[in-house]
């Protein structure tokens, strides 16, 4: 069991009401416009309608563009080897095994050129509600409820399936690769149905080692619904975020299977989702509570992008110095430049 000792965060009655409403609405909002398996990707011609103009005026980072046509986009991963973006699409409630999830492959040099790389229910593929993405060699890994699936990142062909159901996995969420090649997977412990979201637990962090052996690195309520996870090559540690709506925790643990320890509890509330570490060690993370992307550096936490509704599992385009933000409830992915905020990521 984790030995982490969180400190509860006091929120106003209004903040608590908003947070609870957001959690309940997630699976009820239609994700996709036309019901097709692969909505057409393209540029957004109505930025003002989603609050982009307000966010631009109050953000330190620079807004570049919005790409539309996704269906519940949950995670964006940049592959510097091929200069492409991968986007996972849940298309519906996040715990329903409906075999209609899909993953887009998009050329970073021309984001309107996206295509469907992996489609549930076709070509021998099973894919329900893909969430976190990670790349290891030529394999694209994604968390899919209680299974970790691996696909060829070029052809989309299924390569591997690691079943966590025998361990009682509830909601596998984010995926990250360690420097030793192990795969770390968070289990947020929530059920996302068309009727709402229920936290059943257990909250866990799994590690997949050689020969697909699964072990538990940390477990317990103290993890507060672990969500985003990433390896920090600068600090030589894992960074883990909590999705608890009232206690926004940022946690760390060194390489190995020791339980995470608390780095910071956010005064502004919880519902932390995606996390990335930049080359200088700065930590970027998303917050549903204040609809922002934050940067944690030198002990200081500051929002650098504002007015982004329900930002999910972000990626970083290291060639262009962009942060890539999936907006699940809108079916959009936004691109923001970090120039002027942090140095280029090459």
Model-predicted regions and their roles:
Residues 33-36:
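Bacterial signal peptide processing site
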Residues 62-67, 112-124, 157-165, 213-219, ...:
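A short beta-strand motif characteristic of beta-propeller blades
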Residues 91-95, 147, 190-194, 244-248, ...:
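Short glycine/acidic-enriched loop and turn motifs that connect beta-strands
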Residues 70-82, 93, 121-139, 166-190, ...:
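Beta-rich, blade/repeat-based domains predominating
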Residues 107-111, 152-157, 208-212, 254-258, ...:
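Short loop/turn segments that connect beta-strands within beta-propeller blades
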Residues 99-104, 147-149, 203-206, 249-251, ...:
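A short loop-to-beta-strand structural motif that recurs across blades of beta-propeller domains
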Residues 50-73:
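A short helix->beta-strand "capping" segment at the edge of beta-propeller domains
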Residues 87-99, 186-201:
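Short, conserved, GDST-rich strand-edge loop motifs in beta-rich repeat architectures
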